[in-house]
UniProtKB/Swiss-Prot annotation:
Fe cation 2 binds at residues 94, 105, 108, 141. This is Vacuolar iron transporter. The chain crosses the membrane at residues 29-49, 56-76, 163-183, 187-207, 215-235. Keywords: Ion transport, Iron, Iron transport, Membrane, Metal-binding, Transmembrane, Transmembrane helix, Transport, Vacuole. InterPro entries: Ccc1_fam. Fe cation 3 binds at residues 97, 105, 108. Residues 1-28, 77-162, 208-214 are cytoplasmic. The gene is VIT. It comes from Centaurea cyanus.
Protein backbone atom coordinates (compact mmCIF):
# COMPACT_ATOMS: atom_id res chain seq x y z
CA UNK A 1 0.00 0.00 0.00
CA UNK A 2 1.16 3.57 -0.63
CA UNK A 3 2.70 5.73 2.05
CA UNK A 4 1.68 9.20 3.17
CA UNK A 5 3.54 11.92 1.27
CA UNK A 6 5.89 14.44 2.82
CA UNK A 7 3.37 17.29 2.64
CA UNK A 8 0.73 15.17 4.37
CA UNK A 9 3.23 14.13 7.04
CA UNK A 10 4.05 17.79 7.64
CA UNK A 11 0.38 18.67 8.10
CA UNK A 12 -0.20 15.71 10.42
CA UNK A 13 2.80 16.63 12.54
CA UNK A 14 1.62 20.23 12.80
CA UNK A 15 -1.84 19.20 13.94
CA UNK A 16 -1.86 16.72 16.80
CA UNK A 17 -5.39 15.65 17.70
CA UNK A 18 -6.11 14.93 21.33
CA UNK A 19 -8.82 12.31 21.59
CA UNK A 20 -9.82 10.35 24.66
CA UNK A 21 -8.82 6.76 23.85
CA UNK A 22 -9.22 4.98 27.20
CA UNK A 23 -12.94 4.40 26.77
CA UNK A 24 -12.89 0.71 27.69
CA UNK A 25 -10.96 1.34 30.90
CA UNK A 26 -13.29 4.18 31.89
CA UNK A 27 -16.28 1.92 31.19
CA UNK A 28 -14.84 -0.75 33.51
CA UNK A 29 -14.17 1.81 36.24
CA UNK A 30 -17.73 3.13 35.92
CA UNK A 31 -19.16 -0.39 36.18
CA UNK A 32 -17.05 -1.19 39.25
CA UNK A 33 -17.59 2.11 41.04
CA UNK A 34 -21.32 2.41 40.37
CA UNK A 35 -22.11 -1.04 41.75
CA UNK A 36 -19.46 -0.79 44.47
CA UNK A 37 -20.92 2.41 45.88
CA UNK A 38 -24.56 1.40 45.55
CA UNK A 39 -24.79 -2.27 46.60
CA UNK A 40 -22.80 -2.21 49.89
CA UNK A 41 -24.44 1.14 50.68
CA UNK A 42 -27.91 -0.35 50.28
CA UNK A 43 -26.91 -3.47 52.24
CA UNK A 44 -25.51 -1.45 55.15
CA UNK A 45 -28.57 0.80 55.21
CA UNK A 46 -30.87 -2.22 55.11
CA UNK A 47 -29.08 -3.96 57.99
CA UNK A 48 -29.13 -0.70 59.97
CA UNK A 49 -32.87 -0.61 59.45
CA UNK A 50 -33.06 -4.15 60.84
CA UNK A 51 -31.28 -2.94 64.01
CA UNK A 52 -28.10 -4.93 63.37
CA UNK A 53 -24.93 -3.89 65.21
CA UNK A 54 -22.09 -2.05 63.49
CA UNK A 55 -19.82 -5.10 63.78
CA UNK A 56 -22.36 -7.33 62.03
CA UNK A 57 -22.98 -4.73 59.32
CA UNK A 58 -19.23 -4.30 58.81
CA UNK A 59 -18.66 -8.06 58.58
CA UNK A 60 -21.55 -8.54 56.17
CA UNK A 61 -20.48 -5.51 54.15
CA UNK A 62 -16.88 -6.65 53.75
CA UNK A 63 -18.07 -10.13 52.77
CA UNK A 64 -20.36 -8.58 50.16
CA UNK A 65 -17.58 -6.37 48.80
CA UNK A 66 -15.27 -9.38 48.44
CA UNK A 67 -17.94 -11.52 46.78
CA UNK A 68 -19.12 -8.66 44.59
CA UNK A 69 -15.59 -7.84 43.42
CA UNK A 70 -14.97 -11.47 42.45
CA UNK A 71 -18.32 -11.77 40.70
CA UNK A 72 -18.04 -8.46 38.85
CA UNK A 73 -14.42 -9.09 37.90
CA UNK A 74 -15.27 -12.54 36.58
CA UNK A 75 -18.15 -11.06 34.60
CA UNK A 76 -15.83 -8.47 33.06
CA UNK A 77 -13.29 -11.16 32.18
CA UNK A 78 -15.88 -13.39 30.51
CA UNK A 79 -17.39 -10.47 28.58
CA UNK A 80 -14.00 -9.35 27.23
CA UNK A 81 -13.00 -12.95 26.46
CA UNK A 82 -16.27 -13.45 24.58
CA UNK A 83 -15.59 -10.33 22.48
CA UNK A 84 -12.09 -11.60 21.66
CA UNK A 85 -13.42 -15.04 20.69
CA UNK A 86 -16.07 -13.44 18.49
CA UNK A 87 -13.41 -11.35 16.72
CA UNK A 88 -11.26 -14.44 16.11
CA UNK A 89 -14.20 -16.38 14.65
CA UNK A 90 -15.17 -13.53 12.33
CA UNK A 91 -11.54 -13.02 11.30
CA UNK A 92 -11.27 -16.66 10.21
CA UNK A 93 -14.58 -16.51 8.36
CA UNK A 94 -13.64 -13.29 6.56
CA UNK A 95 -10.23 -14.68 5.61
CA UNK A 96 -11.89 -17.79 4.19
CA UNK A 97 -14.26 -15.66 2.10
CA UNK A 98 -11.38 -13.58 0.73
CA UNK A 99 -9.58 -16.79 -0.24
CA UNK A 100 -12.60 -18.57 -1.77
CA UNK A 101 -14.77 -15.78 -3.21
CA UNK A 102 -12.41 -12.83 -3.78
CA UNK A 103 -14.57 -11.22 -6.48
CA UNK A 104 -17.57 -11.10 -4.16
CA UNK A 105 -15.47 -9.62 -1.36
CA UNK A 106 -14.04 -7.04 -3.78
CA UNK A 107 -17.59 -6.09 -4.75
CA UNK A 108 -18.37 -5.62 -1.05
CA UNK A 109 -15.42 -3.23 -0.75
CA UNK A 110 -16.79 -1.26 -3.70
CA UNK A 111 -20.24 -1.19 -2.09
CA UNK A 112 -18.82 0.09 1.20
CA UNK A 113 -16.90 2.89 -0.52
CA UNK A 114 -19.94 3.78 -2.63
CA UNK A 115 -21.93 4.31 0.58
CA UNK A 116 -19.45 7.07 1.44
CA UNK A 117 -20.15 8.80 -1.86
CA UNK A 118 -17.03 7.57 -3.66
CA UNK A 119 -17.61 7.24 -7.42
CA UNK A 120 -16.80 4.00 -9.34
CA UNK A 121 -13.86 5.53 -11.18
CA UNK A 122 -12.47 6.57 -7.77
CA UNK A 123 -13.06 3.42 -5.74
CA UNK A 124 -11.97 0.74 -8.23
CA UNK A 125 -8.28 1.73 -7.94
CA UNK A 126 -8.69 1.40 -4.16
CA UNK A 127 -10.35 -2.02 -4.54
CA UNK A 128 -7.57 -3.24 -6.82
CA UNK A 129 -4.93 -1.90 -4.47
CA UNK A 130 -6.49 -3.76 -1.53
CA UNK A 131 -6.63 -6.99 -3.55
CA UNK A 132 -2.85 -6.77 -3.92
CA UNK A 133 -2.46 -6.55 -0.14
CA UNK A 134 -4.48 -9.37 1.50
CA UNK A 135 -3.59 -8.29 5.05
CA UNK A 136 -4.83 -4.74 4.49
CA UNK A 137 -7.88 -6.13 2.66
CA UNK A 138 -8.78 -8.34 5.62
CA UNK A 139 -8.29 -5.47 8.05
CA UNK A 140 -10.51 -3.22 5.90
CA UNK A 141 -13.31 -5.80 5.84
CA UNK A 142 -13.15 -6.36 9.59
CA UNK A 143 -13.37 -2.64 10.33
CA UNK A 144 -15.75 -1.36 7.66
CA UNK A 145 -17.94 -4.37 6.88
CA UNK A 146 -18.21 -5.90 10.35
CA UNK A 147 -17.34 -2.89 12.50
CA UNK A 148 -14.86 -4.92 14.57
CA UNK A 149 -11.55 -3.70 15.98
CA UNK A 150 -8.79 -6.10 16.95
CA UNK A 151 -9.03 -6.52 20.74
CA UNK A 152 -6.09 -6.15 23.07
CA UNK A 153 -4.95 -9.69 24.00
CA UNK A 154 -4.62 -8.56 27.64
CA UNK A 155 -8.03 -6.89 27.61
CA UNK A 156 -9.88 -9.67 29.50
CA UNK A 157 -7.49 -9.68 32.46
CA UNK A 158 -7.26 -5.88 32.52
CA UNK A 159 -11.05 -5.61 32.52
CA UNK A 160 -11.40 -8.11 35.36
CA UNK A 161 -8.81 -6.37 37.54
CA UNK A 162 -10.10 -2.86 36.79
CA UNK A 163 -13.70 -3.75 37.66
CA UNK A 164 -12.74 -5.74 40.77
CA UNK A 165 -10.39 -3.07 42.16
CA UNK A 166 -12.91 -0.30 41.44
CA UNK A 167 -15.61 -2.31 43.21
CA UNK A 168 -13.45 -2.86 46.31
CA UNK A 169 -12.29 0.76 46.56
CA UNK A 170 -15.78 2.17 46.18
CA UNK A 171 -17.48 -0.58 48.21
CA UNK A 172 -15.45 0.24 51.32
CA UNK A 173 -16.60 3.89 51.33
CA UNK A 174 -20.13 3.24 52.72
CA UNK A 175 -18.63 0.92 55.36
CA UNK A 176 -16.06 3.38 56.74
CA UNK A 177 -18.39 4.93 59.38
CA UNK A 178 -19.21 1.48 60.77
CA UNK A 179 -15.49 0.96 61.48
CA UNK A 180 -15.43 3.92 63.89
CA UNK A 181 -19.01 4.31 65.15
CA UNK A 182 -20.26 1.33 67.21
CA UNK A 183 -23.92 2.38 67.16
CA UNK A 184 -25.34 1.42 63.76
CA UNK A 185 -28.17 3.96 63.85
CA UNK A 186 -25.60 6.76 64.16
CA UNK A 187 -23.16 5.16 61.74
CA UNK A 188 -25.80 4.93 59.02
CA UNK A 189 -26.25 8.72 59.05
CA UNK A 190 -22.53 9.23 58.48
CA UNK A 191 -22.56 6.48 55.85
CA UNK A 192 -25.33 8.25 53.96
CA UNK A 193 -23.47 11.57 54.00
CA UNK A 194 -20.13 10.05 52.96
CA UNK A 195 -21.65 7.88 50.25
CA UNK A 196 -23.85 10.60 48.76
CA UNK A 197 -20.79 12.86 48.59
CA UNK A 198 -18.81 10.05 46.91
CA UNK A 199 -21.68 9.43 44.48
CA UNK A 200 -21.74 13.12 43.56
CA UNK A 201 -17.99 13.13 42.85
CA UNK A 202 -18.21 9.86 40.93
CA UNK A 203 -21.22 11.04 38.93
CA UNK A 204 -19.48 14.31 38.06
CA UNK A 205 -16.35 12.48 36.90
CA UNK A 206 -18.44 9.99 34.94
CA UNK A 207 -20.26 12.78 33.14
CA UNK A 208 -17.00 14.59 32.40
CA UNK A 209 -15.28 11.56 30.85
CA UNK A 210 -18.33 10.30 28.95
CA UNK A 211 -19.19 13.67 27.43
CA UNK A 212 -22.44 14.15 29.37
CA UNK A 213 -23.35 17.11 31.56
CA UNK A 214 -21.22 16.56 34.70
CA UNK A 215 -23.58 18.30 37.14
CA UNK A 216 -26.63 16.44 35.86
CA UNK A 217 -24.71 13.16 35.93
CA UNK A 218 -23.64 13.82 39.53
CA UNK A 219 -27.20 14.54 40.68
CA UNK A 220 -28.61 11.55 38.79
CA UNK A 221 -26.01 9.15 40.23
CA UNK A 222 -26.54 10.41 43.78
CA UNK A 223 -30.32 10.17 43.41
CA UNK A 224 -30.16 6.55 42.25
CA UNK A 225 -27.92 5.63 45.19
CA UNK A 226 -30.18 7.44 47.65
CA UNK A 227 -33.29 5.68 46.32
CA UNK A 228 -31.59 2.27 46.52
CA UNK A 229 -30.47 2.79 50.12
CA UNK A 230 -33.81 4.26 51.21
CA UNK A 231 -35.68 1.32 49.70
CA UNK A 232 -33.37 -1.19 51.40
CA UNK A 233 -33.62 0.64 54.74
CA UNK A 234 -37.41 0.83 54.55
CA UNK A 235 -37.87 -2.83 53.60
CA UNK A 236 -35.49 -4.01 56.32
CA UNK A 237 -37.21 -1.80 58.89
CA UNK A 238 -40.60 -3.17 57.86
CA UNK A 239 -39.40 -6.78 57.99
CA UNK A 240 -37.80 -6.25 61.39
CA UNK A 241 -40.99 -4.72 62.77
CA UNK A 242 -43.18 -7.56 61.49
CA UNK A 243 -40.81 -10.25 62.81
CA UNK A 244 -40.53 -8.86 66.32
CA UNK A 245 -44.17 -7.89 66.77
Amino acid sequence: MGEVGESEKYLLNRHKEHHFTAGETVRDIIIGFSDGLTVPFALAAGLSGANASSSIILTAGIAEVAAGAISMGLGGYLAAKSEADHYTRELRREQEEIDTIPDTEAAEVAEILAEYGVEPHEYWPVVNSLRKNPKAWLDFMMKFELGLEKPNPRRALQSALTIAISYVLSGLIPLLPYMFIPIAQKAVVSSVIVTIFALLIFGFAKGYFTGNKPVWSALQTALIGAIASAAAFGMAKGCASSVFE
